[in-house]
């Protein structure tokens, strides 16, 4: 964490001192002082490494140098092409072992690997598949053949289908392709943002019938927590649509059932993994809803928050920002909690756009005016200096999701990501993964690697990684005492990680 005003005064003073004494031959001592001051402002720049950490940092810098000097630099490449190289990197291997704290920006239907979804869930009894006219698939669990619909004229029991065909591996692979964005040639497959977003939202529709089956819903969440835990994450905040879940006989469960199920699964997972801190839900709705629907949804969010205070963290809008309604359109609905004296924290997606000067481009400012707790993505923040300063002074962090921003075509080369500037300035932020399963990424390690290597090059060090991990807990919605306990637990894990990495 940076002391804003003292740091700024030191910066201005040193600049004036240097300029006042410029005589054509710069003083090397002042140059060194400027370099040191700039380094201190970076994310992690004010963290003092102990002797063991310094040894590990020396090792890390050598590993980084190797990746930087390799013929292909992964952050400069599309993730789908770079993943193979990243997986072979010793830096990535170290980051995987590193305790990363919390994942604060993750979506419910994209947190579990699609391999598990296909090879576990679609092999369960009573799972039906439909091959649609749009060359996609739909799934549903049913005690008998499901009724036909406008998008599915014929359903096939998957168990029977697998018994009839010889190559079940190819069938499973086709399902996996329908559940991810991965392709060998992403530039050709997704020539623009609208194309990739259309495919992106289609993926969620494919997963919908699987994940909303009530028994799978619970198993899916448990598996998601397990996969994040295995990636050395101790706490998760999940953006969740909380759709109706269904039973085998077609009965539907409401949002209260889903929240209670989340609470049950999280408690069960914590019982089995005592060092896991927990998980909370940020209730979300698509930003294409109208004003009347927004009022109803915010009222629903307040009820959920009242009924499930331990698991319900707050509210957000999701969906392609450029094609959705701007936050200001929902001003009446978003003002309801304050008008009623109710605390409903907001966690708005804002600035996930490169459309400067549009109504959507004002979402960053409006998010702060509505007192958002964190800002999802904030890709456009660097183009709004006043809003950026507001966010810094309000200590509102940006949830940066590097791979998502690249795959959804906001940036091609991650060295050019605006977060590189934010981290150089020590702006409050966290690194998260958004939709790792859809991108074929690990829970968080791939995004950490891309940020660490792409945003700062050789200037980032072990202190950068340590502060990012600490930030993830500092900016979580954990109550103060639990937050302090979580940070203490993280530091114990961190010391163990440093020790073991030096063996």
UniProtKB/Swiss-Prot annotation:
Residues bound to substrate are 108, 197-204, 286, 319, 435
User: Per UniProt, what is one Pfam family of this protein?
Assistant: A_deaminase_N
Q: Where in the cell is it found?
A: Secreted
Disulfide pairs here are 130-152
Query: Biological process GO terms, please?
Result: adenosine catabolic process; inosine biosynthetic process
Q: Report the EC number(s), separated by commas if there are several.
A: 3.5.4.4
- This protein is called Adenosine deaminase 2-A
What is the phylogenetic placement of the source species in the record? Eukaryota, Metazoa, Chordata, Craniata, Vertebrata
């Amino acid at each position: 964490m940076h002391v804003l005003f003292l740091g700024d005064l030191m910066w201005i003073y040193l600049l004036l001192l240097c300029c006042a004494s410029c005589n054509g031959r710069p003083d090397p001592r002042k140059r060194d002082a400027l370099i040191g001051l700039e380094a201190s402002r970076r994310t992690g720049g004010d963290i003092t490494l102990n002797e063991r950490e310094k040894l590990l940092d020396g090792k890390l810098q050598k590993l980084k140098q190797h990746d930087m000097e390799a013929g292909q630099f992964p952050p400069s490449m599309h993730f789908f092409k770079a993943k193979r190289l990243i997986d072979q990197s010793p830096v990535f291997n170290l980051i995987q072992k590193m305790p990363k704290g919390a994942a604060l920006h993750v979506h419910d239907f994209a947190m579990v690997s699609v391999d598990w979804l296909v090879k576990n869930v679609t092999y369960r009894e009573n799972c039906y598949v439909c091959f649609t006219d749009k060359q996609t698939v739909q799934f549903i669990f049913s005690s008998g053949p499901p009724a036909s619909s406008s998008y599915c004229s014929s359903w096939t029991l998957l168990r029977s289908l697998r018994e009839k065909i010889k190559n079940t591996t190819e069938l499973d692979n086709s399902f996996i392709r329908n559940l991810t964005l991965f392709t060998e040639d992403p530039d050709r497959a997704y020539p623009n943002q609208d194309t990739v977003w259309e495919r992106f939202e289609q993926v969620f529709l494919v997963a919908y019938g699987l994940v909303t089956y009530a028994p799978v819903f619970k198993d899916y969440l448990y598996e998601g927590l397990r996969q994040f835990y295995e990636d050395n994450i101790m706490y998760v905040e999940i953006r969740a649509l909380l759709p109706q879940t269904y039973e085998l006989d077609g009965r539907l469960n409401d949002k209260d059932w889903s929240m209670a199920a989340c609470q049950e699964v999280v408690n069960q997972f914590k019982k089995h993994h005592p060092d896991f801190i927990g998980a909370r839900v940020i209730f979300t709705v698509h930003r294409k809803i109208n004003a009347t629907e927004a009022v109803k949804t915010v009222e629903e969010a307040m009820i959920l928050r009242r009924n499930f205070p331990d698991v319900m963290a707050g509210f957000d809008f999701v969906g392609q920002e450029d094609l959705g309604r701007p936050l200001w359109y929902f001003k009446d609905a978003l003002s309801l909690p304050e008008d009623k004296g109710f605390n409903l924290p907001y966690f708005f997606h804002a600035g996930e756009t490169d459309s400067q000067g549009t109504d959507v481009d004002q979402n960053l400012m409006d998010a702060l005016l509505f007192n958002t707790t964190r800002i999802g993505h904030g890709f456009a923040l660097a183009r709004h200096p006043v809003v950026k300063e507001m966010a810094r002074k309000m200590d509102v962090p940006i949830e940066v999701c590097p791979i998502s921003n690249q795959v959804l075509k906001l940036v091609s080369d991650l060295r050019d990501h605006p977060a590189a500037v934010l981290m150089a300035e020590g702006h409050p932020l966290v690194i998260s993964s958004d939709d790792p399963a859809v991108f074929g990424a690990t829970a968080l390690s791939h995004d950490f690697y891309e940020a660490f290597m792409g945003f700062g090059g050789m200037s980032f060090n072990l202190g950068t990684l340590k502060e990012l991990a600490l930030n993830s807990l500092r900016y979580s919605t954990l109550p103060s005492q639990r937050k302090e306990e979580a940070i203490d637990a993280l530091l114990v894990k961190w010391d163990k990680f440093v020790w073991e990495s030096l063996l």
